[in-house]
Amino acid sequence: MKLALKDFQDAAVAVLVRRLRQAAGEAKDGDLQSVALSAPTGSGKTVMAAAAIEALLQGDDRHAPDPEATFLWITDQPDLNEQTRRKMLQASSALKSSNVVVIDSSFDQETFSPGSLYFLNTQKLGKEKQLVTPGDSRTFTFWETVTNTVNARPGSFYVFIDEAHRGMAESARNQKEATTIIQKFIKGSDGEISKVPLIAGISATPERFNTLIEGAGRITRPVDVSPEEVRSSGLLKETVTFFHPTENQPSDITMLRAAAQSWQDFSGRWKDYCREEDELPVHPILVVQVRDASGKQISKTNIAEAIRAIEEEAGPLDNDAFAHALQEGARLEVGDRELRYLAPADIQGDPAVRVVFFKAALNTGWDCPRAEVMMSFRPAKDGTLIAQLVGRMVRTPLARRVDSDERLNTVSLYLPHYDEAGLKKVVDTLTSKDPNVLPPADIEKGEDMVPFVVPLAVTMRLPLWRSCRPTQCRGRERRAR
C-alpha cells in the first residue's frame, strides 16, 4: 500500500482478507457466500477494501498471489465510483489505471479480465439500457459477461456492493430501482443472470447489508469495526460547533459573514501549523448550501450577494477560488462572475478552490477533509440532510488530530434558519448512534451554543469551542486563539 493504515484498519484488513479467502474456497465448490465489512462513517472503508484487494492480488507470506482474482465494485451513482476509483489508485500499489476499469455503455467482453478491478453504477443496468440489451452491435450483454466469469472462475470473482453511501439524497423510487438491480447479483434473475457465488458488502452497519441479502441462503462472514476505534484514531474531528440565532434574528448575510470570518481563521491557523510542522499546505474550504430553484433562477439564494459578502470579509479571491456543484458540467453566470462546476469527487483534490456552492449534491459519498466551515441557507426541515453532511465533513485533513491547536480539531456550521427546536433535530440525528451518519457523540449546551463533542474530547478535557451570535464571533475567535 502507498498509504500507511491505522492500527484498527490493519487489523480489520487482516480479518477481511481471511474471510474473503475462506469464502472464495467455499464459493469454488458452489456454496453461496457473503462477507460483510461494517465500519462507521469516516473509518476509511474504501482504503481498507483497497488493501484487501491488493493482498488477494499480490499474496503475502502465507498465501500465493491469485492471478485469477477479478473484482467488480458496484454503487448506484457514477460520481461515487469515480471518487472510489481515485482513492483506490492513490492508496494501492497493486491497482493502476491499466487494471482499473470504469464500465460504460460500450463495454462488451465475454468475461471480466483476471487481475482487474471494474467499477459499475447500477444506472447502467436499467431497463432498455445498452449494456443489458442484446443487438447486432453487441456480442455479449453485461449479464452474460457476469455469468461467463462466474462459470470460468467462481472462487476468484469478487463482487463488492458499496452499501455505505447509498440512500442519503435519493428518491424512494431510485433507491428501490437500485436495490432491485443489486438483488439480481445476490439472488439471480431468470433469463438474465445466475447467482454470484461471492458477494462482499461494504456498509456502515451490519443491518444494512444483512437486510439486502436476507433470504438469499448465503453464509455470511462479518468483519466489524467499532465506533470507538475510529474515534480514537484521529481520523475524525473531535468537535462540531453549531452557530445559530437565539434572539434578534440576524440576516442570512450576517451569518455568512461570520462563517467567512471563521473560514479565514481556519486558513490562518492551518498556514501557521503547516509552516511550523513542515507539512504540505492545507487549504480549508467554505461550503455554502443554497436554497432550491425559484422559477428561472437556479436558487432562491442570491449567490452574487453571497460572493460579495465573502470577499468583503476575506478580501478579493481569484475566480477559480469559487466553484459550484449545482448543475452537472455547466458553468454558472453569477452577476459579473462565471462560476466553474466541480463534481463532488473533484473538490478535495482541486488546489485552487476555496468556496463551493451546492444544494444536496455533496451528501452522498462526498469526502472532503478540507471542508471546515459550512453555511446553510436552507430551512430547518432539511435537518437530516444537514446531519448527513456533518458526517461527510468531519474527516481530519491530515488523518490525525492536531495537538498544538485544538481549533484545528473542530468543524463549524452556521444555520441561520434553525431555531432551538430545528437545531435539536440535527443534534438528535447526530447523536442517534447511527454509524451511517457519525460515530456516537455527546452533547453539551451553553447559554447560546449547542456544541457536541465525542467522548474522547471529554475524557481528555479538551476545550469546547462555544457557538455565538454573529456579532460576537470575531472577538471570541481572537481570544480563543
Regions found by a protein language model. Give the residues of each.
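Long, hydrophobic alpha-helical segments
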Residues: 395-481
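Conserved Walker A/P-loop ATP-binding site and its immediately adjacent core
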Residues: 47-51, 64-93, 121-124
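Conserved C-terminal RecA-like helicase domain
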Residues: 43, 75, 100-101, 110-116, ...
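Conserved RecA-like P-loop NTPase helicase motor core
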Residues: 331-429
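Conserved RecA-like ASCE ATPase "motif II neighborhood" in helicase/translocase motors
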Residues: 102-108, 113-160, 168-188, 338-346, ...
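N-terminal pre-P-loop "Q-motif" helix
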Residues: 3-31, 121
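Walker A/P-loop
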Residues: 27-52
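Interdomain helical connector at the RecA1-RecA2 junction of SF1/SF2 helicase-like NTPases
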Residues: 6, 191-202, 209-308
